[in-house]
């Protein structure tokens, strides 16, 4: 999984008011020291917007044996479907595009007013009918859902998007990738990840995609995660650190860690 193009402007902290004004400056050695201290001070330093650079990296990737790349960039963070098509043709690397929404800071303003069903329908359209960036040359369809972003303190719309993503995954059979926040601390991290997995499991139960909600030793954090993982396996999903997919075949699960 990788980002070939990415515009994280909406995720960056507010521009500093004090000099030096390096946020919009060209990426040169003059600002190297400042960027070592804080890489996110400069927009060019965090943008991935060069098709030429992406092509060079894909050529090196293929030379090393790579044949398939999953691009987890969503539309609001700079997804570029037409450029992905050009790169796939130029490098002979198969590129699979994702769909959905990342964390709330990157959401388009209209998303807050959308229902879970309508958000799921948007994802389904991109998987089955093609992305809005499609053109006369052909439909540009997503091949998986994600990466779906969930903040350390999850926003209500993020949780709605997560439930919608599960709904679309169950409807279409598409793999689902969730990108969790970096949460430090054993108990805090356990509760955070447990909450994400619980939402996924609950939504699959609601949709009739899960046959049983029990299982697992809940005396420890690892046991609790193991229990939820087994539930998802019973539903036909294999959950790893960054995503959920349908295993082939579906084998018995084992705990994380």
Q: What are these model-derived regions, one by one?
A:
Residues 1, 69, 169:
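Conserved, mostly hydrophobic/aromatic
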Residues 2-48, 99-120:
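Active-site gating loops and adjacent loop-to-helix segments of metal-dependent hydrolytic enzymes
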Residues 3-5, 74-75, 100-104, 147-150, ...:
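Active-site beta-loop-alpha junctions enriched in small/polar residues
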Residues 38-44, 58-79, 93-105, 140-150, ...:
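Divalent metal-dependent hydrolysis catalytic cores, especially in the metallo-beta-lactamase
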Residues 82-84, 110, 155-160, 184-204, ...:
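Distinct, well-ordered alpha-helical segments
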Residues 86-90, 94-175, 228, 243-244:
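Active-site gating/metal-coordination segments in enzymes
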Residues 92, 172-175, 198-204, 233-240:
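Glycine-enriched alpha-helix->loop->beta-strand junction motifs that scaffold or abut catalytic
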Residues 211-257:
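Active-site-adjacent C-terminal substructures of enzyme catalytic domains
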């Amino acid at each position: 999984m990788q980002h070939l193009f990415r515009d994280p402007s909406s995720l960056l902290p507010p521009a500093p008011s004090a000099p030096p004004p390096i946020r919009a400056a060209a990426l040169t050695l003059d600002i190297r020291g400042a960027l070592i201290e804080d890489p996110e001070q400069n927009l060019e330093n965090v943008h991935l917007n060069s098709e030429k650079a992406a092509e060079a990296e894909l050529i090196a990737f293929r030379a090393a044996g790579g044949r398939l790349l999953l691009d987890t960039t969503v539309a609001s963070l700079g997804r570029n479907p037409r450029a992905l098509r050009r790169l796939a043709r130029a490098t002979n690397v198969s590129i699979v595009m994702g769909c959905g929404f990342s964390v709330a800071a990157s959401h388009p303003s209209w998303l807050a007013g959308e229902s879970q069903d309508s958000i799921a329908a948007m994802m389904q359209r991109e998987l089955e009918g093609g992305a809005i960036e499609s053109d006369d040359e052909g439909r540009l369809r997503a091949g998986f859902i994600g990466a779906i972003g969930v903040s350390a303190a999850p926003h209500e719309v993020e949780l709605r998007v997560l439930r919608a993503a599960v709904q679309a995954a169950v409807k279409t059979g598409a793999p689902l990738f969730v990108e969790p926040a970096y949460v430090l601390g054993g108990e805090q991290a356990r509760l955070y990840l447990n909450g994400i997995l619980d939402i996924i499991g609950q939504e699959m139960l609601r949709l009739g995609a899960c046959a049983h909600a029990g299982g697992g030793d809940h005396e420890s954090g690892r046991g609790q995660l193991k229990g939820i993982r087994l539930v998802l396996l019973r539903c036909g999903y294999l959950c790893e650190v960054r995503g959920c997919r349908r295993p082939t075949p579906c084998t018995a699960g084992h705990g994380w860690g």
